[in-house]
Amino acid sequence: AAGKLGIHIDLYESRYGQYQQDILDHKSGLYAFNPNIVVLAVHEGDLHLPEYSQRPEEDVRKEVSRWTGLWQMVTEHSRARIVQHNFALPCEIPTGHLTTRLSGSRYMMTQAVNTRLGEAAANAVSLVDCERLSALIGKQRWCDPRYWNMSKQAVALEALPLLGRHTAAVIAADLGLSRKCLVLDLDNTLWGGVIAEDGLAGIKLGQGPDGEAFVAFQEYLLKLKRKGVILTVCSKNNHADAIQPFEKHPEMRLKLQDIALFLANWESKPDNIRTIAKTLQIGLDALVFVDDNPVEREIVRKFLPEVDVIPLPEDPSYYLRTLSDYLLLETSSLTAEDTERTDQYRARAQIMELEAAAGSIEDFYRSLRMQAIVVPFDASQLPRIAQLIGKTNQFNLTTRRHGMAQLEAFVLDSSYVHLALRLRDRYTDHGLVSVMIARQQGDILDIDTWLMSCRVIGRTVETTMLEQLCRRAAQLGCTSLRGTYIPTQKNAMAADAYAKHGFERVGNHEGFEVWTYDLAAKGLIANTFVKPVDSWELADGAC
């Protein structure tokens, strides 16, 4: 595995069970060998832990101290970088699922040792996460008792290639041999479809199976960028077409400022890749080419053999996994400069922690530093808006379903007011989460559709939508708003939406409730917890 990465290895191997003696004896063959890398290829059986402990914290502390002591000895007697395998948890557990409730069990102590070693390693020691690798391949495939009984081989033969590849990748990162830069195609790579032919509204990006896959892929790319991987674009496209999604598509996660070098032209991919390497002053062997087109991939392989090429599968749902399986983007450390913000999956947990710690609900809202972009519908948003209208049931006042054709008609009809809201807070961008459609009838602005994604319920987003509708009504010279609530089996939570914002119920016809708001008498509805902004670039304090 190391040879395939360009690492030439001269190997010193301790005798079976003698690695500790080699490390502790400064005159051992290990130090005479003068290693650059010391790999501690250990396994769960090497842990000095009892099957059950009455003092698990103390036993874990001692075991971690034993391993960090070995690290210290290597550091004192050599210049070697240390790479250690952590400990794959066994699958044969006598106490079964009860084990996770027994802090003194060997299983739980092993988990704790893994965690503490990760904390202790910092930037001095690299760990190969064997626990994760064993889960990837399957616990029962990771360790075959036949090989252990015959030769004390802790890792099954079929799992050794996986372990070898990952160990080699960690060594490569320690030696500075990881790849630094992704060269990204655009059409059918970052989004579905061809931007020059399908237009901004026609590409697949956002909600829906394919669209969500491309969003997920972009989000993973952003995470790579945050750990220091350079992102570049190499696309056969007109530049003006190619930048449109980056500048205008609301579901585009990558922005132009995330791209170090953007090349969209009709030059050959090899020529453009050479330009990228030259401009950024990095070698071709630092580049990784990512393109859905097998012909373009083969051309790059042929003319630029130094460049690694990712073989993307046909189904974009597997783009993320394919790139995740590519190991030469491994890094040996992470600094504050490499990371920008907490990822979206951790954001939800952080928000819940923040709410629990807040002194009041008002304090919680303020602490989120929420901001919203509220704009009229545009073509790129319509597929997402149509989907929201089609599937939102809980906070949906009328549950009227409007398709693409109707939405396009609303956009063209000047008597309609239509608003789409995107929400962002201190943790994440929630995307397009609320929609409102109203029609002017004289001095009344009548609300036809008002809905909100369940992801942001309880965040005062509904107040912001009414605030913006009031402002638009005032601009049109309307003196009142009118809304309808049509009860269903699923939208009971929206029953008081009008009442709590000062509307008065004026009628109830065949189960339909009609509400009005006297704009002239009561003034604009306002929300002090969500700050309206024109663009995220102008939104201070977020993320």
Where would I find each of the regions flagged by the language model?
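Basic, amphipathic juxtamembrane/active-site segments
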Residues: I195-L221, P305-L312
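Conserved Lys-Pro-Asp/Glu-containing loop-to-beta segment of HAD-superfamily phosphomonoesterases
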Residues: I273-P294, V300
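A conserved beta-strand-loop-helix scaffold within acyl/acetyltransferase catalytic domains
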Residues: K248, I373, F377-R455
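Asp-based phosphoryl-transfer active-site loop
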Residues: K180-I195
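Alpha-helical cap/lid subdomain in secreted, periplasmic
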Residues: A2-E158, R165-C181
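Substrate-recognition element of Asp-dependent hydrolases with the DxDx(T/V) motif
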Residues: A216-P250, L263, L397-R400, Q406-L407, ...
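Terminal substrate-recognition subdomain of acyl/acetyltransferases
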Residues: T279, R301, P305-L368, R471-C543
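Acyl-donor binding region in acyl/amide transferases
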Residues: R426, L432-N508
